Design a protein with these regions (language model features):
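Conserved class I S-adenosyl-L-methionine
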Residues: 2-49, 63-67, 81-84
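C-terminal helical/coil "lid" or tail adjacent to the Rossmann-like core of SAM-dependent
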Residues: 3-29, 192-249
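Class I SAM-dependent methyltransferase SAM/SAH-binding core
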Residues: 53-55, 59-100, 125
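A conserved beta-strand element that flanks and buttresses the S-adenosyl-L-methionine
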Residues: 112
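Short catalytic micro-motifs in class I SAM-dependent methyltransferases
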Residues: 115-116
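A short glycine-rich, Lys/Arg-flanked "PGG" loop and its adjoining helix->strand segment in the class I
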Residues: 124-139
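Conserved catalytic/acceptor-binding region of the Class I
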Residues: 141-207
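Core SAM-dependent methyltransferase catalytic element
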Residues: 188, 254-266
Length: 266
């Protein structure tokens, strides 16, 4: 799921050998109970008005935008995703950079971004843009996993920590950003800043899209010169033993950060 230059495939969907793979990946995740439940919470926080206009940054295939119960403008950097969301019924999707949104100031009644900031080259700029385009009093919600919170039952915890840390620090642009979002919201002068933490606990290795390729992470690190052959062999052997024994358990925390644009600008 990671390109040779270190960028995650979601940062360059249109350049991938098979862009449809990433469409399929989103569909699989949307089918998981954990994802459905926290997305319902995001909708509740937004409390969209049927007559309002809302923005989703990183709209993907448009699944969330289509069920929010209001007019939604989707933004995605990928033309593949924009076309797919339009084909599924989203009325408006714009191919654009999250750090340079093509909208006037103060036109949106609310906005959200789900699992997108972890991939952005300039996440702080993107947050500033969300604040800029919403109306005073509007709600902003950003959701991301924080891979610094990963835990895994594994016989060799030192090796597991090494592999999981590689995922957090090197397989994503902003793998541990989620824990900082509260401070960023405060610095952006948003009101009523709130953070909710939800733990994704996986007990079967084939669920959640094969846990995002967890078994392959060590070999990816090897390819970048960051892990030895011996460590990779040991990781894969122990991983297979854990799975065969029915002892697999991996977890990561998602952070739902929300706030309101002040009615009176400070």
């Amino acid at each position: 799921v990671t390109a040779p230059d270190g960028q995650h495939g979601f940062t360059r969907v249109d350049e991938e050998a098979r862009p449809a793979f990433w469409v399929e990946c989103l569909d699989k995740l949307h089918g998981e109970p954990f994802y459905r439940e926290y997305k319902e919470r995001v909708r509740a926080i937004l409390s969209p008005r049927p007559t309002g206009l809302y923005l989703e940054v990183g709209t993907g295939v448009g699944t969330d935008a289509l069920v929010i119960g209001a007019r939604v403008v989707g933004v995605d950097r990928s033309l593949t995703m924009c076309r797919e969301s339009l084909a599924r019924g989203l009325r408006t999707c714009v191919a654009a950079d999250a750090g340079a949104l093509p909208f006037p100031c103060g036109v949106m009644d609310g906005c959200w971004s789900d699992r997108t900031f972890q991939h952005l080259a300039h996440p702080r700029r993107a947050l500033d843009e969300l604040v800029r385009v919403v109306k005073p009093g509007a709600t902003i919600v950003v959701v991301d996993p924080d891979y610094g919170t990963q835990e895994m039952e594994f016989p060799d915890q030192c090796l597991a920590e090494k592999v999981l840390n590689f995922r957090a620090r090197h397989m994503l642009r902003n793998g541990t950003l989620a824990r900082q979002m509260r401070q960023w919201f405060v610095e952006a002068r948003l009101d009523d800043v709130c953070v909710e933490e939800r733990a994704l606990i996986v007990r079967h290795p084939t669920s959640v899209d094969n846990v995002m390729g967890l078994r392959s992470w060590a070999r990816t690190a090897l390819g970048r010169g960051m892990m030895s052959d011996a460590d990779v062999d040991r990781w894969e052997s122990l991983y297979d033993d854990v799975v065969a024994a029915g002892r697999f358990r991996w977890s990561v925390s998602f952070f739902i950060t929300s706030g309101h644009k002040p009615v009176v600008q400070r």
